Amino acid sequence: MRTSSRMENQASLSSIQRAVWDGKLPLQITLASSESRTYDQTDPYLIACPRISYLPSLLPRLRAFFSSSLIEPNSQPHEGWFSFEGVPLKWHLPVGLLYDLYAGADPASKGTRIDETDHPSSSLSDTLPWRLTVHFSDWPDEELVRLDADGMVMHDAFINSVKEADFLRNGTAKGIMTLSKEDSAGLWQAVQDVDLPSFQRISNILLPPPNQPFRNIPIRFFLPLSPDSGSPSLKVVQSPLPPSIPVATNTSQSTNLRNSPATQVQTLGSALHSLLPNLFPSRRTPVLAKPVLHGAAVPMSAPIEELVRSCAYGDGWAYIVIRMMG
């Protein structure tokens, strides 16, 4: 029975992962008016963009689409960058995370679709399609690292993030460091192509098997700050989080179990309570804030290892946005 239950759980996690990779966001991208021959009369570029993808992958087709409108005809695709309401967007963060951070409507805790392009609710009507601006000049050097024509800056940033996740999962980055050059390039290409089977073939080399727990969980929490806070617009919280934690016991029980302490599964609620107790005073119920991943509110009872196995972005990280309630 235990084997059957484990197989059912694996099938469920695989189904969730497929839904995550199928998730898309409708984007409406406009050329910066200061770079357009027709100011604000240029037609926008519309696309259903995979949530797990990265904005720079759109630059070649955007450069071609807006070529006849550009004041500067010699600009190159890798010189492009994106902004939302005047804020430069970090190109190393996945599209879905950027949307959840800057524009995501209040998510429903039940019945939320990962693919927001299908029948968006009225709460999403004001934020979808997500309206972005693309620029091919005036790179914001103080906020963004420049890209290169060969795409190696983007590739290296992705692989470095994969290395960090690999180290946390296994206690060593040996897996990614010994990955062949072909598989390393293939992992990044699979994310660019949104090719889940090819991605799984390579990523499964790095993941501990289902019956072997992670050493620590690669998960980051993003807390948007108000513009007048005097701090960067985003605060990232990260700490080593094991997949299991000691069970709270009384003194006598603790003495009896000293040599073999009982453990329980680390849930998202227990992790948030330990890292952000002021925002999450309860381990079980969101009171002041809610965790959002891939556009959906995540149950506090979700085991964080299962969450990462099924819902991580292509670099192996679960990026969770903390959204205030009320």
Curated annotation (Swiss-Prot):
Topological relation to the membrane, as annotated: Peripheral membrane protein
Crosslink feature (Glycyl lysine isopeptide (Lys-Gly) (interchain with G-Cter in atg12)) location: 163
Keywords per UniProt: Autophagy, Isopeptide bond, Membrane, Protein transport, Transport, Ubl conjugation
Functional description taken from the UniProt entry: Involved in cytoplasm to vacuole transport (Cvt) and autophagic vesicle formation. Autophagy is essential for maintenance of amino acid levels and protein synthesis under nitrogen starvation. Required for selective autophagic degradation of the nucleus (nucleophagy). Also required for mitophagy, which eliminates defective or superfluous mitochondria in order to fulfill cellular energy requirements and prevent excess ROS production.
Designated name of the protein: Autophagy protein 5
Modified how: Conjugated to atg12; which is essential for autophagy.
Gene name as annotated: atg5
GO cellular component, one term: autophagosome
Pfam families for this protein: ATG5_HBR, ATG5_UblA, ATG5_UblB
Record's subcellular location: Preautophagosomal structure membrane
Gene Ontology biological-process annotations: autophagy of mitochondrion; cellular response to nitrogen starvation; piecemeal microautophagy of the nucleus; protein transport
One example GO MF annotation: Atg8-family ligase activity
Assembly notes: Conjugated with atg12.
Species annotation: Neosartorya fischeri (strain ATCC 1020 / DSM 3700 / CBS 544.65 / FGSC A1164 / JCM 1740 / NRRL 181 / WB 181)
UniProt similarity note: Belongs to the ATG5 family.
